[in-house]
Amino acid sequence: MVHLGALPGTPLYDEQRGLEGLVAQARADLVALQEAGVDAVMFGNENDRPYELEVGTASVAAMAYVIGRLRPDVRVPFGVDVLWDPCATVALAAATGAVFAREIFTGLYASDMGLWSRQAARALRDRRLYGREDLFLMFNVSAEFASPLDARSVVERARSAVFSSLADAVLVSGPMTGEPASLEVLARVKQALPDVPVLANTGVTHDNVAEVLRVADGCIVGTCLKKDGITWNPVDPQRAVAFMERVRRIREAIM
């Protein structure tokens, strides 16, 4: 993950550093991750706390500006996520040429931000309107900071997201950013969806990545690669290198 700094207009935005400061820090994180050998990177606005369910155009424009400035430095496939707005995420992906996008596309949740009522239908129609049918959509089916107002299990919600909402991949999360998803739930979701990529979305660390990759097809990693393992800190190049070295050993053992 390349967590962009707080964007203009959000409570934690650093006006002194400005947009150029955001570009500089994101570039440093991007370079560190690529030199460590990651498979892909995803740009997100995790620092825009408290989060919005409908993100303003100014934030989307700022993210597009930063990503556009970084495009010459990007050497791996990249994706985007505009928390917590699936339509803004698809729009940003279309504007920047992202290969994949992550968001909460389905479900009804009670959360710190109020009630989430997601509409995959609109987001996927936007994808079609933008001419980006190739955009790979990863559906988070167990939202952080929220509880589903749905009696169905995570497995049932995941199966439904694929069947009725055309999810390209399914993500399983822990209760908070940086906290792990249940390995048991991950395994059950993967067993139910053998032909669909299933990834761990939060809380993957140097210590548990081997267990995660035994049951999931992949993982999205942010917090454990940061300085001192703190989500809001810059990427620590040494932690990133150590993590990817461990992943390579795991892959060699599996193969």
Identify the role of each PLM range:
Residues A151-V170, T177-D195, D207:
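Short loop-to-alpha-helix "cap/lid" segments that border enzyme active sites
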Residues V80, D85-A98, E156-R157, V189-P194, ...:
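Catalytic cores of alpha/beta
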Residues L33, V41, A101, A161, ...:
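Conserved, mostly hydrophobic/aromatic
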Residues L4-Y13, A88, L92-A169:
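Conserved anion-binding
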Residues V2-A28, F78-D85, F139-V155, A200-H206:
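Active-site mouth loops of central-metabolism enzymes
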Residues G37-A62, L108-D112, A167-P180, D228-I230:
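Glycine-rich, proline-tolerant flexible connector loops at the mouths of alpha/beta enzymes
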Residues M1-V2, V41-F43, F78-V80, A101-E103, ...:
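Hydrophobic faces of well-ordered beta-strands that scaffold small-molecule active sites
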Residues E52-V80, R118-F139, A181-T205, Q238-I254:
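Alpha-helix-loop-beta-strand connector modules within alpha/beta enzyme cores
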